[in-house]
Amino acid sequence: MDENRKKALAAALTQIEKQFGKGSVMRMGDVGAVRNIEAISTGSLGLDLALGIGGVPKGRVIEIYGPESSGKTTLTLHIIAESQKLGGTAAFVDAEHALDPVYAEKLGVNMTDLLVSQPDTGEQALEITDMLVRSGAVDVVVVDSVAALTPKAEIEGEMGDSHVGLQARLMSQALRKLTGNIKRSNCCVIFINQIRMKIGVMFGSPETTTGGNALKFYASVRLDIRRTGAIKKGDEVIGNETKVKVVKNKVAPPFRQAEFDILYGQGISREGEIIDLGVAEGFIDKSGAWYSYDGNRIGQGKDNVRNFLCENPGIAQAIEARIRDKLLPKGGVEAPAEADVPEPSED
């Protein structure tokens, strides 16, 4: 760059900083420009690896959607528990009024420190979310769910009244306000969403999410979570087989998948994932029904090995650390070009 252009740029930067404050524009090579993306573990080793950075990114909007009883709230409660383990503060905006504190505690959530709000209207829920984010003291905010964010006009109106596009407009306006604050405060905001069917769709998927299109654009990560089968012990069903697809990812390559078990009353079976990934990556040897680690037999059959790892958390952590070290990128994560799956809105 020639001297005149350098002087012109320096003058422009000085003027911008004078008018809008120091740090309003900076070079990415400067010390103040943060390039590494911090992540919070999801509680699932396979999903952490599928997300490419070891969890959900901080300072971003996340959307988790899926059918009923697929594990959406369970997954967010695990994220809250992992954040609290690192000394973080978490908030749960319970628009559905369906949070089970006993179940949350079983998943490792510290209910004493968890901030819970049960708002009356969608506007109130999103205003509370914005204020928590702007405080800069909250690490994770979960909104459960977008479908339950009822606009004030709808609550005050009659049951049969038509309110076309009200929720979509509410979400669009809220996300415009929220996004900048979320980035500045480095808070992770997770929206849980439900699925609806579009009528008259001949080709492609008839499924869509509620609340319009805005969330699809503003979300850095979108996770599609599905129940794929039942886990049985004899005739008794003790859990769900779950599959999560990373539909959109702005911080790592998208379209990866993770499969894990959700056990009733326990949540995500981390030990089950460690066994599967340990065998796949060669850290655990499987010979017939026997499993071995570092030359020592640790059990016959997956259930026995799972129990062994539950009783010996040190070994489980050592195997997990080796898997993460091998499969997760070292150093800073640079975001690739966005890849999105366009879906028309119901609104």
From Swiss-Prot:
Alphabetical list of CDD domains matching this protein: RecA
Compartment(s) where it occurs, according to its Swiss-Prot or TrEMBL record: Cytoplasm
A single GO cellular-component term on record: cytosol
GO molecular function, one term: ATP binding
Name of this chain's protein: Protein RecA
HAMAP family found in the cross-reference section: RecA
Biological process per Gene Ontology, one example term: SOS response
Keywords, comma-separated and alphabetical: ATP-binding, Cytoplasm, DNA damage, DNA recombination, DNA repair, DNA-binding, Nucleotide-binding, SOS response
Main subcellular location of this protein, as a coarse class: cytoplasm
PANTHER family in alphabetical order: MITOCHONDRIAL DNA REPAIR PROTEIN RECA HOMOLOG-RELATED, RECA
Stated role: Can catalyze the hydrolysis of ATP in the presence of single-stranded DNA, the ATP-dependent uptake of single-stranded DNA by duplex DNA, and the ATP-dependent hybridization of homologous single-stranded DNAs. It interacts with LexA causing its activation and leading to its autocatalytic cleavage.
This protein's record includes keyword ATP-binding: yes
Family note: Belongs to the RecA family.
UniProt xrefs under SMART domains: AAA
KW Cytoplasm (keyword) present: yes
Gene behind this protein: recA
